[in-house]
Structure formats: structure tokens, C-alpha cells
Regions:
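Alpha-helical transmembrane segments in inner-membrane proteins
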Residues: 1-338
């Protein structure tokens, strides 16, 4: 099959899957909504006030938020894999999500214990600061080690340290706030509002557009820094852009939904395998579509499998994402042994 035809089919399939999963997220739940209920609520002609409230205030903003954050997480993972030239680099593995998680937990505990409310922008700024701190630590380690496996292990250790400190911080939260902090720290898309959607969209969409605009120099960067510099890519500025974009995307996800594992690692590789191409110009849009669809599927499972009990989203993404990482490591080991 020709590459262009294969990509066309793959993109159409991903778009169809995204639309189908988005619709299912609106229909399914502890209270099932019929297509007529959905249409009436969207058109403002419904007489069922409960159905309209469930759709417009709960399920629709949540589904839109899942699409935004799923796309952000997948693209952030791809940017990190490009920057570190490491196939298992990702916001969760490299400790970036955990750094953001620690900063947000500190901010929430300080504000909530003083009876103050934390706005979305405050949490995002805190998450970005934590993500950048973790990223700078990883970069400092990267200058001292040659083997990427050591760097990944250091990233995982950073994640454990940040998670341990976060647990200590949560222990000092007031009893009334512990449940919310615990649910957030486990990863969840529940409780999303249209205000959250607007704030996330204002950050995620420009970052995704910027990443797409960087796809051409990214392709040169993948061939090595020397080659990228020889074709006119400002390597230092480009590297800073990758770090900032990936950290901001990961921070936005963590601020709203908590740390979510394996999406940033697994989805980019599934997209490259599906498209049969590793070119950023082709992979980046696929990562956005694939990440959104993957998170919609996982969120649907998380809230429907044992309803009304809702699973943490990170638990579900790990179940589906971890086997992909294992497959990737086994395949690379087999290729290296040849």
C-alpha cells in the first residue's frame, strides 16, 4: 500500500474513532442519554432539564477537556522523545508530570488551608514551575551521563521523590480537602467546567500550533544536532522551544487532571507504527488525534466499567499503555541483537 494512501486511511480511521468515542462519552454514564435527548439539549429545545444539565454542564465539558488534554499529553511525549532521542521519554517517565504534581499539591494545600480558592491559571503556573524544575534537573543529569537508560532511570527516581513529597504534603491538608487532593493526585477528568475548557484551550491550542510549525526543523533535529545546525536550524533556540512546549503541555494536563501515565510514551509509537512514517509533519497531527481518542476511550472505561465507582484515569491508561512500552523495549532489544 502506498504511504500516502495508508496515511489517508489511517487519518480517516482516527478521526472516525475520535468522533465515535466522543459521542459515546456523551451517551454513556450512570444515567443513559438517548440521541434525541442529546439533540434536544444541544438545540436548546429539550423539556428534560435533568438531561440538559447532565449533558451541557457535566459530560460535554468533560469530553472536550479530555480531547484537549489527551492531544496535549501525546504531543508533549513526542516532543520529549525527539529532544532526548529516546523512545521511552515522556512527561511521566522523565519525572516532569511528578514535578508539576508536587508544585500543584503545594499550591493547593497552602491556598486551601488558608481558606482561599485556587484559580485555573494559578494551578497552571504552579504546574509549569514544577515541570520546569524537574526538566532542568533531568537536563543537568543528561550532561553528566552518556547512556540514555541511566537518564531514564534518573527521571523515574525524580518521579518517585516528587510523589513521596506530594504524599507528605497531602498529609498536612485539612480533612475536608484530602479527598479532592487524593482524587486529583490519582488522575481524573471529573469536575471539568467550561471555564476550565476555555483556560486549557487558550494554552493547549497555541502550543499544538507551535509544535506543528516546528515540524520541519524537528525533522532535521532528529538526524542529529550537527546536521540540524548545518541546514540552518538554530539548535539552542530550537531545543529551548521543545523544552518549553513539552513542559507547558504536560503542566496544563497535570494542573487540571493530575498525573496521567503512559499516554505520552505509547501513543506516539502507535501513531508512527500506524502511519508507517516518523516524519514530524505527519506524526504530530496523528499524535493529537490519537492522544485525544485514546484518552476518550480510557475515560469512558474509567467511569463506566464499575459505575458509579470511577477508576483513576492513570490506572486505565497504564493498563493499555504499559504493554505498548514493553513491546517497544522487546522489539528494540531484538533489533539490537541482530
Amino acid at each position: 500500500m502506498h504511504t500516502s494512501k495508508r496515511m489517508t486511511i489511517a487519518y480517516l480511521a482516527m478521526a472516525a474513532a475520535l468522533l465515535a468515542l466522543f459521542a459515546l462519552n456523551l451517551f454513556w454514564g450512570s444515567i443513559a442519554l438517548s440521541p434525541s435527548d442529546i439533540a434536544a439539549a444541544l438545540l436548546g429545545r429539550g423539556t428534560n432539564a435533568l438531561a440538559a444539565n447532565i449533558l451541557l454542564q457535566l459530560r460535554l465539558p468533560r469530553a472536550v477537556m479530555v480531547v484537549l488534554l489527551g492531544a496535549a499529553l501525546s504531543v508533549a511525549g513526542y516532543l520529549l522523545q525527539t529532544f532526548f532521542a529516546n523512545p521511552i521519554a515522556g512527561p511521566f517517565v522523565m519525572g516532569i508530570s511528578s514535578g508539576a504534581k508536587l508544585a500543584v499539591a503545594l499550591t493547593m494545600v497552602v491556598f486551601l488551608n488558608r481558606g482561599l480558592l485556587t484559580g485555573s491559571l494559578t494551578l497552571i503556573l504552579a504546574a509549569f514551575a514544577g515541570a520546569m524544575a524537574a526538566m532542568l534537573f533531568v537536563l543537568a543529569v543528561a550532561r553528566r551521563v552518556q547512556r540514555m537508560s541511566i537518564l531514564v532511570i534518573c527521571g523515574v527516581m525524580i518521579g518517585y521523590i516528587c510523589s513521596a513529597i506530594t504524599d507528605i504534603v497531602v498529609a498536612f491538608a485539612q480533612d475536608s480537602n484530602i479527598v479532592n487532593l487524593h482524587n486529583w493526585s490519582m488522575g481524573s477528568f471529573s469536575g471539568m467546567t467550561w471555564g476550565n475548557v476555555a483556560t486549557a484551550a487558550a494554552i493547549v491550542l497555541p502550543c499544538l500550533a507551535a509544535a506543528f510549525l516546528l515540524s520541519k526543523p524537528m525533522a532535521a533535529y532528529q538526524l542529529g544536532e550537527s546536521y540540524a545546525a548545518s541546514v540552518g536550524v538554530p539548535v539552542r533556540a530550537f531545543s529551548v522551544a521543545l523544552v518549553l512546549l513539552s513542559s507547558l503541555l504536560a503542566a496544563c494536563v497535570t494542573a487540571f487532571a493530575g498525573p496521567i501515565s503512559f499516554v505520552g510514551i505509547a501513543v506516539p509509537h502507535l501513531i508512527k507504527h500506524t502511519l508507517g512514517s516518523a516524519k514530524p509533519l505527519r506524526v504530530l497531527p496523528g499524535c493529537a488525534l490519537g492522544g485525544a481518542a485514546f484518552c476518550l476511550l480510557c475515560d469512558l472505561i474509567a467511569r463506566s466499567l464499575f459505575a458509579p465507582t470511577e477508576l483513576s484515569i492513570s490506572s486505565v491508561t497504564a493498563v493499555f499503555g504499559a504493554p505498548v512500552v514493553i513491546w517497544l523495549l522487546v522489539r528494540r532489544n531484538q533489533e539490537g541483537a541482530r
